[in-house]
Amino acid sequence: CLLSRGLGDVYKRQIYFRANAEKKLKRTVHQWRPVIDYSEKDVWEVMKRNKVNPHPCYRAGWNRCSCAGCIFSTPELFAGFKELYPQEFEEMKHDEKALGFTLDNKCDLETYIEGAKPCLYKGDKEAIHSLITGIFTESQIFIDGQWKYPAGAFHGAEGGPC
């Protein structure tokens, strides 16, 4: 296996997948991570070259694409979450009270985002619609016209929304 960034066995390009079952099911399952050595710019350039439409999260201003209410989100990401999903944000606040435990060790969610500028970019109405409705069709995978970097590109790797 090719190793990544001199990190030894931690980040291999190809590893055995956790569902690997050579002995019991007589099958070998690999996990291939072809872009593990790519920089963020490298990934965006591949998408640009192939006119791949970025995930709506990136187009709506988020810097990462994972759980919308990720506990590792920054105040700006949670402020964007609140703006896009107000009911779910209220449910998270309710859960903090019900559990007697806050996502941040020092304050509740509302205090955590106080004064934060939401990451949400409202200029891509199609992306906002996709995030609210969950609808993203096959016809939206590629871009016909000019490709451009999404609003969430190059904003670091903190947090983990959408």
Regions found by a protein language model. Name each.
Residues 20-42, 50, 95, 99-100:
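Short, flexible loop segments at boundaries between secondary-structure elements
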Residues 52, 73-162:
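Peripheral terminal appendages
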Residues 2, 68-71, 120:
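Secreted/luminal cysteine- and crosslink-motif detector
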Residues 36-91:
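Mid-to-C-terminal catalytic subdomains of enzymes
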Residues 9-26, 73, 85:
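Short, surface-exposed, charged loop/turn segments at secondary-structure junctions
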Residues 1-11:
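Single conserved hydrophobic/aromatic residue that forms the stacking wall/gate
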Residues 4, 61-64, 156:
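Processing junctions and N-termini across compartments
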